Amino acid sequence: MELWLDEALELKNGRALKIKVKEFLHSRTTPFQKIDVFESVGFGRMFTLDGVVMMTEADEFAYHEMIVHVPMMSHPNPEKVLVIGGGDGGTVREVLKHPSVKEVHLCEIDKGVIDVCYEYFPEIANAMKDPRVKHAYEDGAKYVKDYQNYFDCIMVDSSDPVGPAEVLFKRPFYETMANCLKEGGICTTQGESFYYHGSIIRELFNFIPEIFKHCGYYYTVVPTYPSGIIGFTYCSKGPDPYTVVPDPQRVPQGLKYYSAEMHKAAFVLPQFAQKHIVRK
């Protein structure tokens, strides 16, 4: 009997992602969500939260490299970094590729995600065991309130704006992040797909330009995410990632997606998507 995963995230809009499953490996329900792990035929090992694909071994690098290296390469000397969400460890792994980093705070509300990823995705998750990484299992929107003028870079590696992640797409959270960043600090947040989620993106850019010196949107290509595209909002109190010319000598070795050229290209949006964005 063939097994297939049908991702239901876009089902109400008449769209679905179907992935052939080789083996069902694990399932658990935490106080926050249901976590499932599969061995897929075409994308390697993968996990879902409440039936929505979060990561696969085959394409995770495209997301993790772009959420991290665009802000990190735009900042002249990122030493203190905050990752909100990101319990799979991929974002932390990429952050630690920058030798300037002295301290990484990982704020993941659901410890169950980290535990599952340690067991089933050790090559990705073990980066979270680095001694520079400080773990906090709490709401990221509350965590940032405890730090003022502290972080050089913040990456909000969140799920979609439902349930526990909904607050991470609201104005008060962005205002608190601005206070949390040092002068010259930069943050990036998971910004949905400009094909499917234009209304969410427009809502974000109704208030982000009022809070930050620079802001805008860029994207990456991930086959197992809705529409195959996932975007990021960037917000900066200092350098503008859109105009920064990355130093090729600072680009970490061994990357699969990010490069100095890709950094520049990621900001080029199709005309229909530009109407959702305010670049400042």
Swiss-Prot record:
Its EC number is 2.5.1.16. Pfam families: Spermine_synt_N, Spermine_synth. One of its GO terms (molecular function) is spermidine synthase activity. Pathway: Amine and polyamine biosynthesis; spermidine biosynthesis; spermidine from putrescine: step 1/1. Keywords: Cytoplasm, Polyamine biosynthesis, Spermidine biosynthesis, Transferase. InterPro entries: PABS (IPR030374), PABS_CS (IPR030373), SAM-dependent_MTases_sf (IPR029063), Spermi_synthase (IPR001045), Spermidine_synt_N (IPR035246), Spermidine_synt_N_sf (IPR037163). It is found in: Cytoplasm. The active site is at D157 (proton acceptor). It catalyses: S-adenosyl 3-(methylsulfanyl)propylamine + putrescine = S-methyl-5'-thioadenosine + spermidine + H(+). Its main location: cytoplasm. Residues 2-237 form the PABS domain. PANTHER family: SPERMIDINE SYNTHASE, SPERMIDINE/SPERMINE SYNTHASE. Belongs to the spermidine/spermine synthase family. NCBIfam families: PRK00811.1 (NF002010), speE (TIGR00417). This is Polyamine aminopropyltransferase 2. The gene is speE2.
